[in-house]
């Protein structure tokens, strides 16, 4: 069960709320890796609910760099609704092949009229805010290994909350270049730090772009990671 659907269960939506929510969700769409769901400067007219694959929000700098400001995993929604009708100050791009649905602005407004569904969007927004605060602390206060360890823990915790982990393994498709855009390090520094973490026996790479965490406590300690700070559902 993906995170947004996990939240639906957690907030005790009635059958009518669930029916209304599903009725206002658009058809499933699929796009290739690198495709844009939205671009900086565009007016936000719909919300994107990620079904399969990963996407990211990023900023385009004048020097051509594209620092990633947040990750969108299956079950995540691109905005809690507060950004509707405003110009985006970021872009959204698929970093793997992506499957998603949309909720247009008119449908979103109708959904917000239902108190429990409004709470659902607010809860999703609270999680996004908590993750963003964790990223700020990660970049400003941790060393290279700590930043990467924290990111690995965060993605595992978010995947676990969405029911997408198995025996310590989870899908982690980020390239070293993309990791560098998340944690603010060079690709070379990322490579060295990842190798150090692997040599410590904390993680190992698996097939199909998966990672296995062999020592959760050790990895969490290295990254000073605390899952409760992300406000994820139990």
Model-predicted regions and their roles:
Residues 1-33, 76-78, 82-85:
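Cyclic nucleotide-binding regulatory module and flanking cytosolic helices
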Residues 26, 44-45, 170:
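Short loop/turn microsegments at loop-to-beta-strand junctions
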Residues 31, 50, 213:
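Conserved catalytic Walker-motif region of ABC-type ATPase nucleotide-binding domains
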Residues 35-97:
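Cyclic nucleotide-binding regulatory domains
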Residues 47, 69, 100-101, 171, ...:
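A residue-level structural signature of the nucleotidyltransferase/glycosyltransferase Rossmann-like core
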Residues 70-134:
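Cyclic-nucleotide recognition modules
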Residues 119-184:
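Polybasic "coupling" helices that flank or enter modular domains
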Residues 158-234:
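Phosphate-/nucleic-acid-contacting segments
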């Amino acid at each position: 069960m993906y995170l947004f659907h996990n939240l639906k269960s957690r907030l005790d939506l009635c059958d009518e709320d669930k029916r209304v929510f599903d009725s206002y969700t658009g058809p499933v769409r699929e796009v290739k890796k690198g495709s844009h769901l939205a671009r900086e400067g565009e007016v936000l007219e719909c919300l994107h609910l990620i079904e399969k694959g990963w996407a990211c929000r990023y900023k385009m700098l004048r020097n051509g760099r594209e620092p990633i400001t947040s990750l969108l995993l299956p079950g995540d929604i691109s905005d809690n609704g507060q950004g509707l009708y405003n110009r985006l100050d970021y872009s959204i791009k698929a970093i793997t092949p992506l499957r998603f649905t949309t909720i247009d602005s008119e449908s979103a407004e109708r959904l917000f009229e239902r108190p429990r569904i409004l709470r659902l969007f607010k809860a999703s927004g609270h999680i996004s805010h908590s993750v963003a605060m964790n990223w700020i602390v990660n970049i400003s206060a941790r060393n290279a290994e700590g930043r990467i360890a924290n990111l690995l823990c965060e993605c595992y915790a978010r995947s676990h909350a969405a029911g997408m982990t198995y025996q310590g393994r989870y899908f982690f498709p980020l390239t070293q270049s993309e990791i560098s855009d998340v944690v603010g390090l060079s690709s070379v520094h990322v490579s060295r730090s990842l190798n150090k973490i692997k040599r410590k026996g904390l993680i190992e790479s698996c097939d199909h772009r998966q990672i296995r965490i062999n020592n959760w406590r050790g990895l969490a300690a290295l990254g000073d990671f605390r899952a409760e700070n992300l406000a994820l559902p139990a």
